[in-house]
Amino acid sequence: MEALNARFNVLQEMLMDIYESGKEDLETQIEHWKLLRQEQALLFFARKHSIMRLGYQPVPPMAVSETKAKQAIGMMLTLQSLQKSPFGKEKWTLVNTSLETYNAPPAQCFKKGPYNIEVIFDGDPENLMVYTAWKEIYFVDSDDMWQKVQGEVDYAGAYYKDGTIKQYYVTFADDAVRYGTSGQYEVRINNETVFAPVTSSTPPSTGLRESSNASPVHDTVDETPTSTTATTTTFSTTTATATATGAPELSSKTGTRKGRYGRKDSSPTAASNSRKEVSRRRSRSRTRTRRREASTSRSQKASRSRSRSRSTSRGSRGSGGSVTTSRDSSPKRTRRGRGRGGRSRRSPTPTSTSKRERRRSRSRGGEPVSGGVGISPDKVGSRVQTVSGRHLGRLGRLLEEASDPPVILLRGDPNILKCYRYRDKKRKLGLVKHYSTTWSWVGVDGNERIGRSRMLLSFTSNSTRSQYVKIMKLPKGVEWSFGNFDKL
């Protein structure tokens, strides 16, 4: 313990020497990350051996120390690679080689010379966003060689060039759609308007969505001084509207370019009005024809059903002989009674009548009859979802609510219950649906806790709960019991 504290104090003193010296060489920055790695290794070792404090420094969890140690190793290797490049002799400060600067946009690059870019959306000075751009950017190309380029800004965003390809790390068009309504934005650097308002998003007439990585299109570029003292570069949007997708709006009918404030469609002529009137008349005539056909079919169906019911009733009354099915004197079709071996319609039996009555009662949404199917005892407590009250009677809802979710109630020391919950989750048995936090009962007259702490374990069915009880390994002093809830 004493040796560990002594080594930790030595590392702290060496780090303080680097901070106070303020050296700006790459060798010092590599040494700084090396000491940070050793510091995290000591903290990891201390926490592994249940040491919670080194001197005045609290020891973090092992996962935190492990993550920071890996980050320090990665930065140390990256700086060693940069040291072998032609840029290893330049000035490098602690800020330039910090992890935050390295991961800031553009990520995985070293940057120098930050400056701010102000973007105003919708022409509202209050709707302003500040971005950070960089003058010098160091990155590794596809050949694993370090390159140094100048950061640049245009109407689309901040970027740097990897060969001839622009690599944008800030895009204004995306935020123009997010923070603005009209899609216009204005770019300012050092309180000077560099780019005039640019329309970044308009609804395309074709209804198609294009690539969001393309840059806005402008047909003309005018460099004229504005009323202010700053010189502005104005990108005209009268001839082509730049969208958030970076393409001009196209007409859906002719396929030609159509400006945002372009000419509208011509007013309707007399010929077009007459064509519209003819189409209206045709649609009305079709509607009337459909209605007449529908009414005719309904009347025919009703007449057929009435004639069928009359013939059935007459056939059931006769015990034999021939029975005519039409009202006129000339018999057309006869049905033989049972006495002569012919066929006749069967009279409704009590079984079929009861089935029809049962179906009729169910269709009305009422309660099931006394002979309906209930719920078996082994199914009680098998439902987890809350029962809906729609389309259920009182008896139907009672049967549905009989399937309550089963639970197990644990009683014991709160810390022991928490440790058991943690270990049981690690086992990942897949039997427990939910674990509750530890809780306690309180009295009616005060807030004093009564008895030991409790914790609930819910299950999807009684079978899963039974399986869990067979393999359950409770700590000493923990009691358990079964239970059910109306809903969780």
From Swiss-Prot:
Task: Could you list this entry's UniProt keywords, alphabetically sorted.
Answer: Activator, DNA replication, DNA-binding, Early protein, Host nucleus, Phosphoprotein, Repressor, Transcription, Transcription regulation
**Any idea where this protein resides?**
Host nucleus
Bias kind Polar residues: ranges:
196-215
Main localization of the protein described in the UniProt heading: host cell
InterPro entries of this UniProt entry?
Answer: E2/EBNA1_C_sf, Nucleotide-bd_a/b_plait_sf, Papillomavirus_E2_C, PPV_E2_N, Reg_prot_E2, Regulatory_protein_E2_N, Regulatory_protein_E2_N_1, Regulatory_protein_E2_N_2
| Low complexity: compositionally biased ranges | 224-245, 312-328
Q: Name one GO biological process term.
A: viral DNA genome replication
Q: Name one GO cellular component term.
A: host cell nucleus
Q: Organism's domain of life?
A: Viruses
Q: Which parts of this chain are annotated as the region Disordered?
A: 196-384
GO MF annotation, one: nucleotide binding
Repressor found in the keyword field: yes
Give the span(s) annotated as Transactivation domain: 1-201
Alphabetized Gene3D superfamilies for the sequence: 3.30.70.330, E2 (early) protein, N terminal domain, subdomain 1, Papillomavirus E2 early protein domain
Pfam families given in the database record: PPV_E2_C, PPV_E2_N
Location of the region described as DNA-binding domain in the Swiss-Prot/TrEMBL record: 404-488
Answer whether the UniProt record assigns the keyword Signal to this protein. Answer: no
Q: How is it modified after translation?
A: Phosphorylated.
Record's compositionally biased regions (Basic residues): 278-291, 301-311, 332-346
Q: What does this protein do?
A: Plays a role in the initiation of viral DNA replication. A dimer of E2 interacts with a dimer of E1 in order to improve specificity of E1 DNA binding activity. Once the complex recognizes and binds DNA at specific sites, the E2 dimer is removed from DNA. E2 also regulates viral transcription through binding to the E2RE response element (5'-ACCNNNNNNGGT-3') present in multiple copies in the regulatory regions of the viral genome. Activates or represses transcription depending on E2RE's position with regards to proximal promoter elements including the TATA-box.
Q: Family, per the entry?
A: Belongs to the papillomaviridae E2 protein family.
Subunit: Binds DNA as homodimer. Interacts with protein E1; this interaction greatly increases E1 DNA-binding activity. Interacts with protein L1; this interaction enhances E2-dependent replication and transcription activation. Interacts with protein L2; this interaction inhibits E2 transcriptional activity but not DNA replication function E2. Interacts with protein E7; this interaction inhibits E7 oncogenic activity. Interacts with host TAF1; this interaction modulates E2-dependent transcriptional regulation. Interacts with host BRD4; this interaction mediates E2 transcriptional activation function.
What name goes with this protein? Regulatory protein E2
Q: Which organism is it from?
A: Human papillomavirus type 49
